[in-house]
Amino acid sequence: MLGDHPVFPILLSIDLDASRSFYRDTLGLRLVREDPGRLVFACGGGTQLVISGSTTGTRDTQTQMAWRVPDIHAALADLRARGVRIEEYTAPDPVTTDGIADMGYAWAAWFIDPSRNCVAVVEPK
């Protein structure tokens, strides 16, 4: 049953004002709802990204969510033009070149949001 329904990520934020500014103003997402302790942004295909206020944030340094994009080079050019710093990794895995890693099944790149969530863009192969 659940396989027939969309999912939406929920990221934790220790500073909702900074998250609002980053996702709305820097990334250009449309803020569709704001409640005490929660922001909801519209994304492609009718999906949504929820940012939930947290006193602790995330302690995980792994990827929390990813956008599937048709052209990772164009996505990175847009992100960089918006002032987003793309992460570079040298070892052990993944290794990036100009911010992009070959994951075998896809090309991927990562950036960090104001609450230290690791977010990716992924171009399937």
Residue locations for each model-derived region?
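N-terminal beta-strand motif that seeds the catalytic metal site of vicinal oxygen chelate
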Residues: 1-17, 62-65, 122-125
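Structural preference for long, well-ordered alpha-helical segments within the folded cores
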Residues: 21-22, 78, 115
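Core segments of cupin and vicinal oxygen chelate
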Residues: 4, 10-48, 74
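Conserved short beta-strand elements that form part of the metal-binding/catalytic scaffold
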Residues: 30-70, 87-88, 114, 118-123
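Vicinal oxygen chelate
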Residues: 1-2, 67, 82-125
